[in-house]
Amino acid sequence: MSLNLENQGNLIAKVMKNEKDTNMKLYVTDKENTVRNGGNSFECKPDKSLQIVPNNKTERQCLYVCGQSGSGKSYFTTNYVKEYKKMFPKRNVYVISSIAEDKSIDSLKPKRINVLHPDFMFDEFTAEDFKDSLVIADDVDVFPTKIKKKYLQLLIVFFR
């Protein structure tokens, strides 16, 4: 595997400076012989950062974002959603959560599914409901047990 800035392989991230795109893009390839200056690690300069971008060459992509309260999970997710909406402006974004709002993510106008709403337990979701969309599951660890079971059934639908 080789990380590179040479447009070889799959795009995985953009190099940002002050939240602005620098036009440098990070790629990953397993064809190491096609890359002149690749490597197995990449380090940004102190004034730059990486923004993960959706992979439009795969049918499905799953990210697991975790961290302590205040660590920047919503900030990271919001920026990822912005990149997703740039690539796929007509696709839906869903937030499945027990929390009524998240100002950061809600600024992007996702469709919210509140797991604490009484209808959630009776809604029958299909894979078609979420086809070609981005689904964010927020604070699943605090879902009541009964709702977690329903949510896990929903995950099975997603991955079929």
What label would you give each PLM region?
Residues 18-22, 64, 92:
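Signal-peptide-cleavage-adjacent N-terminal segments of secreted and extracellular proteins
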Residues 88-90:
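Conserved SF1/SF2 helicase motif Ia
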